[in-house]
């Protein structure tokens, strides 16, 4: 009992003396290292010797254990003993700067690479993003020699050494490619052409790409999916990646005295371990043998990461629709008077966008990311997030809490971040591993990184949309043709999509008016190519207008205006018609594969046939256009009839079926696509 101890302050005592379970308990400071600790009891003066090597400053990181009674025997495997009565001792292990001890190693985390999550975005720690930007820099330098020379002059003037000049020049050119327009500046661009007479068209939108739609007597529209946000995802599990240990306590028993126990074992905040250790005369036991020992330490998490589950109904898609008006800077503005921002959610999948001067476009979207959220978890660590495999996440060997836990202290699997050292007779060292943030970054190699904005997670994936264009109309169809002169403000520039962009300015009278624009062969007999900016118009005199068009491969003339004063610009387009044909066909087939069952209308017999027709147009339209360019539509129909007739009369079954199919496709495309070619 407490009355057994006469706590008279001795002359040399600079430590604090209290009791623990009725036994004396010393709380020792760093200054007592190597000194004899004296205090009086009923049995006389008790002298304790403390030789602990880890004795440091008093802090919350403490060690508590019992110094055994030794009168005549030599101490063995102990660093504290007393000569009158066994005594508890507590001391801190912090350094003078207050730092805690920790184990400088990481948990063996399985790398995420190869876990089977295939997405089209760049993966964590891949060089793809840097390589893409290097390509953009190269293209920008080649297309903007004037700016490049200016950047070189600035770098030469500002820098004092060759290294500084080179670095400044690289930085200036690296910033420049980010200042581009919307669809023209995006390398992954898809052109979707509507079937003549159709009121709707299917498109596939994905991040990092742009879709340009064209249809007869309808404005050309640019669509870009700029953002997919996951709103308020639910937390599945929290993992601790950095922890600290405090209040370490050890209790031990001599052989045959049973298992030791501590009150801390009942507290879920503590991590504990039972072991066996050699005991004998040298450490306070009358018998030699194995004695039990238990050590507990309070586990506190300093930094954690969370795994969140995203439900498809929590996704919100943001699309920007921009009509090709020809106005300066019209293409590429997210907001303002040119572009219209549309929000799509599973709850409101049908939305309308009012395009000033062009009517209304209705979008019926199927919000699908193309990702199976049952197999995925969003791993969020500070300001970064990754898309990881669910099973990989659940198997991480780290302390964790259920997502519903609000207390944040009852961590499960705490021992994964704790190392119990080999036990001594009366004491056992426990250390916590260092921060696992770096190990997690390494293990996440190959996982898809997810961007964050205002606490919401930005996703990847694609969006399938059906555009209804029956309420759209072309602006300026009733205008007369411009009869005055045009001036080239900016020379013809080739885009990375095989199209050209030219900026012209009208100097004549009679605006607003329609701009006469044609692309012709060298003999000026046939109209070739197609206009991407449908029905370009001048709204006011001396106002620059951007026109985008797709010239044919090889030499051609671009003719703007009427005689006299007609602009005639020669243009040569590099490349192969056959190569372009196959590339476009592959794009169409890929688009149909992504659309899947949403491309088909099984609501009516007419809907089925319309869907089949649109599928044929999307996949085979490019081959057909390349094979029969310049051929009249009546001749195309005749060729289709002849191929079908030959197939029906062929004796070979496989050849007959093949020719009949080719003939039917040719007939259909000949009837339906006659209004899509030319300008």
From Swiss-Prot:
The record, for SUPFAM superfamilies, names:
E set domains, Viral glycoprotein, central and dimerisation domains
Disulphide bridges, residue numbers? 183-210, 240-301, 254-285, 272-296, 365-465, 482-513
Q: So which stretches are on the Cytoplasmic side? A: 160-165, 647-652
Give residue spans on the Extracellular membrane side.
23-138, 181-625, 674-679
Q: Name one GO molecular function term.
A: protein dimerization activity
- The feature of type site (Cleavage) is located at 14-15, 105-106, 180-181, 675-676
Q: Which organism is it from?
A: Dengue virus type 2 (strain Thailand/PUO-218/1980) (DENV-2)
- GO cellular component terms, semicolon-separated: extracellular region; host cell endoplasmic reticulum membrane; membrane; viral envelope; viral nucleocapsid; virion membrane
Kindly give the CDD domains that the UniProt entry links to this protein: Flavi_E_C (cd12149), Flavi_M (cd17038)
Q: Sites of glycosylation?
A: 83, 247, 333
Those residues forming the propeptide, per the database entry, are 1-14
Please give the name of this protein. Answer: Genome polyprotein
About its domains, the entry says: The transmembrane domains of the small envelope protein M and envelope protein E contain an endoplasmic reticulum retention signal.
Q: Which GO terms describe its biological process?
A: clathrin-dependent endocytosis of virus by host cell; fusion of virus membrane with host endosome membrane; symbiont-mediated suppression of host innate immune response; virion attachment to host cell
């Amino acid at each position: 009992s407490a009355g057994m101890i006469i706590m008279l302050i001795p002359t040399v005592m600079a430590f604090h003396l209290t009791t623990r379970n009725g036994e004396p308990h010393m709380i020792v400071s760093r200054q007592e290292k190597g000194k004899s600790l004296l205090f009086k009891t009923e049995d006389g003066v008790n002298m304790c010797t403390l030789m602990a090597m880890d004795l440091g400053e008093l802090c919350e990181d403490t060690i508590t254990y019992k110094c055994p009674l030794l009168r005549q025997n030599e101490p063995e495997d102990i660093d504290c003993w007393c000569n009158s009565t066994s005594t508890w001792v507590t001391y801190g292990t912090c350094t003078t700067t207050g730092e805690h001890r920790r184990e400088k190693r990481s948990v063996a985390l399985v790398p995420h690479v190869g876990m089977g999550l295939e997405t089209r975005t760049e993966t964590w720690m891949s060089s793809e993003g840097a390589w893409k930007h290097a390509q953009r820099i190269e293209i920008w330098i080649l297309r903007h020699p004037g700016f490049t020379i200016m950047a070189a002059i600035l770098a030469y003037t500002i820098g004092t050494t060759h290294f500084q000049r080179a670095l400044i020049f690289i930085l200036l050119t690296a910033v420049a490619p980010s200042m581009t327009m919307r669809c023209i500046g995006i390398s992954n661009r898809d052109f979707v052409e509507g079937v003549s007479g159709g009121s709707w068209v299917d498109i596939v939108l994905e991040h990092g790409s742009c879709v340009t739609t064209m249809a007869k007597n309808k404005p050309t529209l640019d669509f870009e999916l700029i953002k997919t946000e996951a709103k308020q995802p639910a937390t599945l599990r929290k993992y601790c990646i950095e922890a600290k240990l405090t209040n370490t306590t050890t209790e031990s028993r001599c052989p045959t005295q049973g298992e030791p126990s501590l009150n801390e074992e009942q507290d879920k905040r503590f991590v504990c371990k039972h072991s066996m250790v050699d005991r004998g005369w040298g450490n306070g036991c009358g018998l030699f043998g194995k004695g039990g020992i238990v050590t507990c330490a309070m586990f506190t998490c300093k930094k954690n990461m969370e795994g969140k589950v995203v439900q498809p109904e929590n996704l919100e898609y943001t699309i920007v629709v921009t009509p090709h008006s020809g106005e300066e800077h019209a293409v590429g503005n997210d907001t303002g008077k040119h572009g219209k921002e549309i929000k799509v959610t599973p709850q409101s999948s049908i939305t309308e966008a009012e395009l000033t001067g062009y009517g209304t476009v209705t979008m019926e979207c199927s919000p699908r990311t193309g990702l199976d959220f049952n197999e995925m978890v969003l791993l969020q660590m500070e300001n970064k997030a990754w898309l990881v495999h669910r099973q990989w996440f659940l198997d991480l060997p780290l302390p964790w809490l259920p997502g519903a836990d609000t207390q944040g202290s009852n961590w499960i699997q705490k021992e994964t971040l704790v190392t119990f050292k080999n036990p001594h007779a009366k004491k056992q060292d426990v250390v916590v591993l260092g921060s696992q943030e770096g190990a997690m970054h390494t293990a996440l190699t190959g996982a898809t990184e997810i961007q964050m904005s205002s606490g919401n997670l930005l996703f990847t994936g694609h969006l399938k949309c059906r555009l209804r264009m029956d309420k759209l109309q072309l602006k300026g169809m009733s205008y007369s043709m411009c009869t005055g002169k045009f001036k080239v403000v900016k020379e013809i520039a080739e885009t990375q999509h095989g199209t050209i962009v030219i900026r012209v300015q009208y100097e004549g009278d009679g605006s607003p008016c329609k701009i006469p624009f044609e692309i012709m062969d060298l003999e000026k007999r046939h109209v070739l190519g197609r206009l991407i900016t449908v029905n370009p118009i001048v709204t006011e005199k001396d106002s620059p207008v951007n026109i985008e068009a797709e010239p044919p491969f090889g030499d051609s003339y671009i003719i703007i205006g009427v005689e006299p004063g007609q602009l005639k610009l020669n243009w040569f387009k590099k490349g192969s018609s056959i190569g372009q044909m196959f590339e476009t066909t592959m794009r169409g087939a890929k688009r149909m594969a992504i659309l899947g069952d949403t491309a088909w209308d099984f609501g009516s017999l007419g809907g089925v046939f319309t869907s089949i027709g649109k599928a044929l147009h999307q996949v085979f339209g490019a081959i057909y256009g390349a094979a029969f360019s310049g051929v009249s539509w009546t001749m195309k129909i005749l060729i289709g009839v002849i191929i079908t007739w030959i197939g029906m009369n062929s004796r070979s079954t496989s050849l007959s079926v093949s020719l009949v199919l080719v003939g039917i496709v040719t007939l259909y495309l000949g009837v339906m696509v006659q209004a899509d070619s030319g300008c």
